[in-house]
């Protein structure tokens, strides 16, 4: 049976991965939702207007939207399908992207309802990263029941109380 930690990591990975695949796709193409795509275009234009330094270094709203959308799509696929350490790397990249997007929302003065989803998914990404970095814990009854060569031992538990 899978440990609660494993179930939590898998559930968060799949859910977050699919969400970011969806959001990245919306930023890249109008095929899923024309309204959401046009809203993303408008939002990224306002982000570049609010931060003139981006324009000075040659980053247009189209490039910014496509870069963030591509990263979200790629990291979402990794988070959903790829096992092991790459999931943690994708999780970290997505967490940085969420922080950047939250910065942009604050910069243009968006109300909380416009970026509440980014806050929630940032918290979920943080939780997934923290849970995945925890070492696997062995339950005390399993430790006690194993003696030499896997035989069951009946030694009492000794606890030091200070």
Swiss-Prot record:
InterPro entries: TMEM35A/B. One of its GO terms (biological process) is positive regulation of protein localization to cell surface. GO terms for cellular component: cytoplasmic vesicle; endoplasmic reticulum; endoplasmic reticulum membrane; peroxisomal membrane. Its main location: membrane. Residues 152-162 have a biased composition (Basic and acidic residues). Residues 141-162 are annotated as: Disordered. Residues 27-61, 110-114 are lumenal. Keywords: Chaperone, Cytoplasmic vesicle, Endoplasmic reticulum, Membrane, Peroxisome, Transmembrane, Transmembrane helix. The chain crosses the membrane at residues 6-26, 62-82, 89-109, 115-131. It is found in: Peroxisome membrane; Cytoplasmic vesicle; Endoplasmic reticulum membrane. Residues 1-5, 83-88, 132-162 are cytoplasmic. The keyword Nucleotide-binding does not apply. It is a multi-pass membrane protein. PANTHER family: NOVEL ACETYLCHOLINE RECEPTOR CHAPERONE, SPINAL CORD EXPRESSION PROTEIN 4. Belongs to the DoxX family. Molecular chaperone which mediates the proper assembly and functional expression of the nicotinic acetylcholine receptors (nAChRs) throughout the brain. Essential for the proper folding, assembly, function and surface trafficking of alpha-7 (CHRNA7), alpha-4-beta-2, alpha-3-beta-2 and alpha-3-beta-4 receptors. This is Novel acetylcholine receptor chaperone. It comes from Xenopus tropicalis. The lineage of its organism: Eukaryota, Metazoa, Chordata, Craniata, Vertebrata. The gene is tmem35a.
